[in-house]
Curated annotation (Swiss-Prot):
This is tRNA N6-adenosine threonylcarbamoyltransferase. It is found in: Cytoplasm. The gene is tsaD. One of its GO terms (molecular function) is iron ion binding. Required for the formation of a threonylcarbamoyl group on adenosine at position 37 (t(6)A37) in tRNAs that read codons beginning with adenine. Is involved in the transfer of the threonylcarbamoyl moiety of threonylcarbamoyl-AMP (TC-AMP) to the N6 group of A37, together with TsaE and TsaB. TsaD likely plays a direct catalytic role in this reaction. The lineage of its organism: Bacteria, Pseudomonadati, Pseudomonadota, Alphaproteobacteria, Rhodobacterales. NCBIfam families: gcp_kae1, T6A_TsaD_YgjD. GO terms for cellular component: cytoplasm.
């Protein structure tokens, strides 16, 4: 790694417009413009609205990141941009801006896989050495990866249907809670009894590291409908207990599947978690306890680097650029982009969902 590289990162793959400047692992600036209020009335991210908002905010985010870092564009060594996977309108907006900046300034360009940004985050936040085990858990993805290099990822398993973040979002919608669903369900669960509703733990009876979360959502829907039929509606305690039971089931699945992934990951330097769902306190604490039990160093990046941000894109671009990777002005935006092409595609693999 060349520590003196100064990298401008650009991220626009879902509903956060972000730009950041890194010099080595040092974050000189990180700007994020969210779209939560824009999509609140629709119960989820509307791709067309998200794309238009990115167009309005991308240049503002880049200007703010450069200003905060007290740098001009000609002082940047590399421009790193998310080129996929994601909602194609937003990804395309970011790629087009990055290509324009590169063409106008002569600054080299590197396209970054958004998932690689999450997977490499423990490298710049905690200096975690290769190889390590990564649980990438977000709105659109859930997979175990053995991370062996900036562009070397081996998938051990993943979700065969919904990602946990998507399940959280849909659960929030079913219970009349605001979006994004993860923080809303987590907040409700704090006042709930996780033992009142015992939801299924899918695929724990099967070997391997694959996961499934769609059945959990269906089980919660049936429990909700049963309460409504019996009592004419949901009480505040009903809602809290449903959230607590649902969250406990998600955590149990993630912890047990992580146990299996760790036991088959010889020679790793540690176990890391990243992605938006990694911001969930119960998920983080459950994984931390597991790592301590198995005597594996555990890394959970600061919350601001678990959710979508451009600092992780700048870092992933810096790692790839230092390893010799380059992109030209023919860089394409990609709605799907699996990290491990040697493995059969998971259902929906490589495409971002509601939030990642």
């Amino acid at each position: 790694m060349t520590p003196s590289l100064t990298v401008l990162g650009i991220e626009s793959s879902c509903d956060d417009t972000a730009a950041a400047v890194l010099r080595g692992p040092e974050v000189l600036s990180s700007v994020v413009y969210g779209q939560t209020a824009l999509h609140a009335a629709f119960g989820g991210v509307v791709p067309e609205l998200a794309a238009r908002a990115h167009v309005e905010k991308l240049d503002i985010a880049v200007a703010a990141a450069l200003s905060e870092a007290v740098l001009a564009l000609d002082q940047i060594d590399v421009i790193a941009v998310t080129a996929g996977p994601g909602l194609i309108g937003g990804v395309l907006s970011g790629v087009m801006l990055a290509k324009g900046l590169s063409a106008a300034s002569g600054v080299p360009l590197i396209g970054v896989n958004h998932l690689a940004g999450h997977a490499l985050t423990p490298r710049f936040t905690d200096g975690l050495a290769f190889p390590y085990l990564m649980l990438l858990v977000s709105g659109g993805h859930c997979q175990f990866l053995r991370v062996e290099g900036p562009e070397a990822f081996h998938r051990l398993g993943g979700t065969i249907d919904d990602a946990p973040g998507e399940a959280f979002d849909k659960t929030a919608k079913l219970l009349g809670l605001p979006q994004p669903g993860g923080p809303a369900v987590e907040a409700e669960a704090r006042a709930g009894d996780p033992a009142r509703f015992v939801f299924p733990r899918p695929l724990l009876d099967r070997a391997g590291c694959d996961m499934s979360f769609s059945g959990l959502k269906t089980a919660l829907l049936r429990a909700r409908d049963g309460l409504v039929s019996a009592g004419g509606g949901l009480t505040a305690q009903d809602r809290a207990d449903l959230c607590a039971g649902f969250q406990a089931a998600i955590c149990d699945v993630l912890v047990e599947k992580s146990r299996r992934a760790l036991t088959q990951s010889e020679g790793v330097t540690g176990f890391a978690v990243a992605g938006g769902v990694a911001a969930n306190e119960q998920v983080r604490s459950g994984l931390a306890r597991l790592a301590a039990e198995l005597d594996a160093p555990f890394v959970a990046p600061p919350l601001r680097y678990c959710t979508d941000n451009a600092a992780m894109i700048a870092w992933a671009g810096q790692e790839a650029f230092s390893a010799g990777a380059r992109s030209g002005l023919d860089l394409s935006a990609r709605p799907r982009w699996p990290l491990d092409n040697s493995q059969p595609a998971l259902l929906g693999s490589g495409k971002k969902g509601a939030k990642a």
